[in-house]
């Protein structure tokens, strides 16, 4: 397998990934089910490695931290400690430090989002009104579409792609190694969107079975999203992700 050493700025760090999982799974941040969140976290890190992204060491440190917390919570208590109120009062929740960091990070992220929205409001005050997108918006609003699809949402969708390929296709006896330019895949996706002139299901882009093609397709979508050539939408947690070309939106 060829190595695509690509660092994606959209990955903001392990706390950001944990917050995404907490929101996606509708978990109480003050009572995190460590076993469940650890399993999901490790799955995302594994997917990043499948994509051969430049996974920062801090993600691996957090993985080790989660496994440590999980182990501490699974350790059997001494029988005498179960009836010793003083020991119970002194005992700390292994999750306490992590929960504190998550709460602080969420405050920081919310504040950053508020500042960003204020800046956008100021910019809009001195620009011409946007084009009328009411026709395009009707369908999206009716479905309560979420237009803020994150990179982690895309990783979750890519996990489904990998699982589906493993289930429906036998493992190849021989893998043909070939270099696939990301630019070619980006052009292929944009040409498809221009031809259809409608939104495309993210999953349908992954027609090939070779890992090289799957990885490059995912990276091509990321690059198109970063360069604002496409927009992604999702109708809710665990729902399919759809891709819309920016040209389609502007022509609506």
Curated annotation (Swiss-Prot):
Keyword Cell division in annotation: yes
Matching Pfam families: SMC_ScpA
GO CC annotations on file: cytoplasm
Localization per record: Cytoplasm
Spans annotated as Disordered: 117-136
Source domain of life: Bacteria
GO BP: cell division; chromosome segregation; DNA replication
Keywords: Cell cycle, Cell division, Chromosome partition, Cytoplasm
Keyword Lyase found: no
Family under the similarity heading: Belongs to the ScpA family.
Cross-referenced HAMAP family: ScpA
Subunit text: Component of a cohesin-like complex composed of ScpA, ScpB and the Smc homodimer, in which ScpA and ScpB bind to the head domain of Smc. The presence of the three proteins is required for the association of the complex with DNA.
Function: Participates in chromosomal partition during cell division. May act via the formation of a condensin-like complex containing Smc and ScpB that pull DNA away from mid-cell into both cell halves.
Entry protein name: Segregation and condensation protein A
């Amino acid at each position: 397998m060829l190595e695509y050493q690509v660092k994606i700025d959209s990955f903001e760090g392990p706390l950001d990934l944990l917050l995404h999982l907490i929101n996606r799974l509708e978990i109480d941040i003050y009572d995190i089910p460590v076993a469940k969140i650890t399993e999901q976290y490790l799955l995302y890190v594994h997917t990043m490695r499948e994509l051969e992204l430049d996974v920062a060491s801090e993600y691996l440190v957090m993985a080790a931290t989660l496994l440590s917390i999980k182990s501490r919570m699974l350790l059997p208590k001494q029988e005498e400690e179960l009836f010793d109120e003083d020991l119970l009062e002194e005992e700390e929740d292994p999750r306490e430090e992590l929960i504190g960091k998550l709460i602080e990070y969420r405050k920081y992220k919310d504040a950053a989002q508020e500042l960003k929205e204020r800046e956008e409001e100021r910019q809009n005050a001195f620009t011409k009104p946007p084009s009328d997108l009411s026709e395009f918006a009707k369908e999206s609003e009716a479905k309560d579409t979420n237009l803020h699809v994150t990179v982690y949402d895309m990783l979750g969708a890519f996990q489904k792609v990998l699982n589906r390929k493993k289930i429906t296709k036998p493992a190849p006896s021989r893998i043909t190694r070939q270099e696939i330019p990301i630019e070619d895949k980006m052009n292929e996706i944009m040409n498809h969107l221009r031809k259809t002139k409608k939104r495309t299901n993210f999953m349908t882009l992954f027609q090939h079975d070779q890992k090289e093609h799957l990885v490059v397709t995912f990276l091509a979508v990321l690059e198109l999203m970063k360069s604002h050539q496409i927009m992604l939408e999702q109708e809710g947690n665990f729902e399919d992700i759809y891709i819309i070309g920016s040209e389609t939106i502007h022509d609506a």
